[in-house]
Amino acid sequence: MVRYRLFGFAFGLSQLLFLVLLPLWLRLLSYLNPVVLAVVWMCLTVFVVFVVYYLCKETVNMPKRVIKILLSSYSVGLLILLFFRPMHQVYNQINYIPFKTILAFLSGNGNMLVAFYNIAANILLFIPYGVAALMFYRNPSKWQLGIVPVVIILLIETTQYLTKRGTMDIDDLILNLLGIWIGYLLYPVIQKVVRVK
């Protein structure tokens, strides 16, 4: 009974936070696919529930199958964000210079919400993949942890560029990899709450 109350509290808190920040999320719609609301909702809900459980030193047993379903749903949402953007945007640029785009965003000359979203989202949205890699592979090799993510992200960047659904940017690769590596570092913390069955 206590666990249900704790989950109810955590879930309610996450929904309240989502609603309070809804004006901010709605501003992203002019720049991104409307599915961004579902992705943000899912991320915020999971994050808040996790933090509440962690602070209360509670654990949750989760079948690997459920985690795979959640990760698959998340991945579909992320692919929609990456490849189905508003039609008025033009993408035909390539950036091979590390940190050029990041520094341009940090300069403060453009839209600060877009700048923050681009940097933060490129990191945060890839953290679950770092966690999942360690969750699903017991003893991953350096190849699996280092090279495979680089190849996958480069494939995404190339496909975005060729289909004119995004720019090909070395900074996206850097930020996405940073997100995955943060996921690796966070995995021991995640294990304290989520027990995979």
Feature roles, as predicted:
Residues 1-164, 170, 185-197:
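Bulky hydrophobic segments
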